């Protein structure tokens, strides 16, 4: 966020990369996309140098992080094809929060038997976990106010990531849109229904939904079908990747109210599905190739 550093990266990427030693971590690198071609040159030269000296391959020279996957994925894959590994980072899983070993969620009988030995939580304890969410800062800082955190998160998300993609006058509509999606988490996607009361077209809603999916806010779970054409025609189900954020946007501020609400089934389903999705991602697997819903 240092504007002088960002200016150097944008205006003179070659000097920027010479200024800092490797391994180098570059945060929010999508703001300086010109860096990618110079990083490619450095990586290729380093590989050639190692090859001549009979050294092992060089990995981990640069760590690029970005919150705007819709930009970073395209630029990175085009500029650094064959030279990168892309990792999606989501909120904490329940196993991570409980300091348990990361484990892929699969319907295996032996795994299910082991789960019998785990602690059985009360319903209210489960909804307290759900409404708190999975963002690391909420667990790192025990004194942080959950509602204040989500308010700041949404404001920062819109001001930093979204403002570049939508008209400034549409920000209030976008907030209403994301709240409408939150209310419908766990349901089949109905664009027209989401648009109700906002005053946006279906085309705008589809664009904004694409932004939410590409920034990791929501996930579209496709229906299962052995017919690819039928799968395309059927509607996906939309899930928030952080159930706590969905609760905040839907207006639920405490676990007791959430537990007694008509929203409890959909948000519980959202919590479980997001845990399953994250278990695949954390094991280096593309969830879209393995997970579907069946009706």
Could you describe each region identified by the protein language model?
Residues 139-295:
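Accessory nucleic acid-recognition modules appended to NTPase machines
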Residues 18-38:
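Conserved P-loop NTPase "ATPase switch" module shared by AAA+ and STAND
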Residues 23-24, 63, 292:
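Hydrophobic "anchor" residues on beta-strands that sit immediately upstream
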Residues 59, 69, 73-183, 187-188:
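Interdomain motor-coupling "hinge/lid" segment immediately C-terminal to the ATP-binding subdomain
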Residues 3-6, 31-33, 71-72:
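Catalytic P-loop NTPase motifs of RecA-like helicase/translocase cores
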Residues 1-23:
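Short glycine-rich substrate-engagement loop in P-loop NTPases that contacts/grips substrate
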Residues 48-57, 110-115, 290:
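Short mixed-charge
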Residues 36-68, 77-79:
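Conserved catalytic/switch belt of AAA+ P-loop NTPases
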